[in-house]
Amino acid sequence: EHIHGAPCGVFWHSALNGDGTPNGYAVYDVEGAAITDWRYKSSLHDESFQIRLHRGGDTHSGFTYPYTPKTVIANVWNADPEWRVTLCENGVETKAMTLVTTYTDAWSVGYHVGVLGRGDNYKSPCKHMYVAEPNDVRAALKVVAVDRWGNRYEQSEFTAPDDFTDARSPVY
């Protein structure tokens, strides 16, 4: 079972859903009666954009993640139990990241509640958040996610605290 993010985000108030997933839709490839691939397509990004990175100590309009500043947090919105999500340091895969499903996306909540002033009903549990602490915090960090079909997605850019440029609803 998969529940995908909505193309309207949080009731058209932003370009992202309450769990941090960007507005978008699912794309399924089907051959006969079999699904041969599926992926999430953000409305404002290309299909390679599957991961958003945060640092554990960052504050987003008053909301933080419950981790130390050296923790790498990866929101991998289309992930399911068959995905493999790993942390790389200086180009070398160093460890598998741990799935945590008990927290909300502090960046999304920071925008919806902290910036827009929406109520607590704009908080959604995030069931696709991964965490890991690097061995060397000075290393060049990258998260690599490989889905059940073998598609590989990478992200090395961290979202800066209170940078909500990507969250704002586009003007059509």
Give the positions of each predicted feature:
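Conserved beta-sheet core of the metallophosphoesterase superfamily
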Residues: 1-57, 93-95, 111-113
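Long, low-complexity serine/threonine/glycine- and acidic-rich segments characteristic of extracellular
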Residues: 53-172
